[in-house]
Structures are given as C-alpha cells and as structure tokens.
Amino acid sequence: MAAVNLRHIEIFHAVMTAGSLTEAAHLLHTSQPTVSRELARFEKVIGLKLFERVRGRLHPTVQGLRLFEEVQRSWYGLDRIVSAAESLREFRQGELSIACLPVFSQSFLPQLLQPFLARYPDVSLNIVPQESPLLEEWLSAQRHDLGLTETLHTPAGTERTELLSLDEVCVLPPGHPLAVKKVLTPDDFQGENYISLSRTDSYRQLLDQLFTEHQVKRRMIVETHSAASVCAMVRAGVGISVVNPLTALDYAASGLVVRRFSIAVPFTVSLIRPLHRPSSALVQAFSGHLQAGLPKLVTSLDAILSSATTA
C-alpha cells in the first residue's frame, strides 16, 4: 500500500473544515480538480470511504468523522509546533541560564530583567548567584549561557566584554556629619566606626592597604560578607563604609547617603560568554539588552553624586 503523506492529511482536513471541494481548494490555493483527485487517492491509500457523494455534494461517513477526530488532534499539535518555532525565531520562548556575583543579582539585574521579560514574556531565566573563584570555574566549565563578574581576568574557555567601570563610593547613614562633604578623603575615616567586607574579599584587602598607606585608623566594628549587608547596616547608623557603586545606588533610594571617594578604586562589570557552549538568538538579545541598559545606571549614580551638598 502506498504511504499516506502530509498533503493527503492537509486536503482531508481542508475538505472537512470547509465543507466543499470548492472552498477547500480556495483554502489551499489550488484547483478543485486537484483537491478532488488527491482526496480520492487518499481514500484509496487508506482503504476507507470517507465521504458519500450525493448530488454533487460531499457528506462525511461515520469512518470519515472518526478519522477527522484523530486528524484534528494531530493538526492542533502541528499548529503548536509551528507556533513554537515562530516563538523561538522571535526570541519569545526559551531558557537562559546566567551565573553572576550575588551583588549583581541584588543590584542592577532585577531592574534590567523587568523590561526584558516584558518584551519576551514566555522566556524563562535562571539566575545563579555565586562568588569568585567558583563563579569563574563554572563559566570555564561551560555550565551557563552567560556570566557576570567583576574580574578583569578572562576565564579559560570564555570571552570577556567589559560592560561598565565605575569607582567605589563612600556610604553614610542619614544625618552623619560627613554627609555635608561632596567628596570624602581617607583622612575623613580616621576614628570612624567602619563596616567592612570579609577579610578574603579583594576590595577589602585593597581598601585596607589604602588606609594603611594614609596612616588612617578606622574602628573596625563589623565585618560582613556582602555589600548589601554593609549598606543595610550603614543605613541603620551602625557605621560608615566604602562599597561598590551599584549596591550603593540600590540603597540610596531608601535613605543611604552616597558620596564620592577622593581616591579611584575601580569596580568593573564584565560579561562572560562560554566559547564552547552553543549560543542562541536569545543569548545575543539579552547581551544586547545588558549593554544598552547598564549605562543608564551611570546616569542615575552621577545624578545622586552631583546632588551632594558641598561643605
């Protein structure tokens, strides 16, 4: 027996849906004789009489109606496949795995994700916070589609694009005497209650060295693991600190005072792409979204720092 092909199913579905050979031919953009010929061939191939022909009109048989029920189920499945393909082509569907430092998942990512997901509502994102150096190891192992780090080193098996570079900033509780200054110097921290990151943090080590070189002694009263925790404690009046500008910007809206530091301590955001993990249009779309959205944070930070009162 000859094989049934998709064209046979398409013609049968069109005839059942349209109710006549003429309308079916119109739906399929072909001629009525072609539809009639292929429908007869389909009946012969499957060995079933699908229609009764009465006075030039087609009437489905019981077998035809039952077969149409099965065709309908398959037809809807085919529609879903076509729709899914269109969605993937237009980035409307898909999954994206992003590994990043915890500071990024708590600062700029939430506000950048909202407009992206509004544009692609059927996309799902998996955000995996991780500290260095394990973060860079995961990216080298090609475990995620994209990575966001503060390192200036490119992990093995990846490519790195610098997205943003800003200086660390000083953070103070509302009403602190130093808040009247527009720029703080290392000497301003002499004898002040200071909230620091953990001893293993590279920025903690850099700042400790800087204050030592300037012979400034701070009162190291609290040590914590994250910049978000530092900012929360500063806002509550526990002490003052120097932190990354992104976390400071996030807390500025809730009362944290942010000031420039007289010494540049660069803080960099880098986008990491694994070289041996299959890329996709979705990866490219999100990368472009990050590159377009991050500069807006610079504008917001500059506005806050520029509004500081000069002593």
Swiss-Prot record:
Alphabetized Pfam families for the sequence: HTH_1, LysR_substrate
GO MF terms, alphabetically ordered: DNA-binding transcription factor activity; sequence-specific DNA binding
InterPro entries linked to this entry: LysR_PBP2 (IPR037414), LysR_subst-bd (IPR005119), Tscrpt_reg_HTH_LysR (IPR000847), WH-like_DNA-bd_sf (IPR036388), WH_DNA-bd_sf (IPR036390)
GO terms under cellular component: cytoplasm
Superkingdom of the organism of origin: Bacteria
Function in brief: This protein activates the transcription of the lysA gene encoding diaminopimelate decarboxylase. LysR is also a negative regulator of its own expression.
The protein's name: Transcriptional activator protein LysR
Taxonomic path: Bacteria, Pseudomonadati, Pseudomonadota, Gammaproteobacteria, Enterobacterales
Gene: lysR
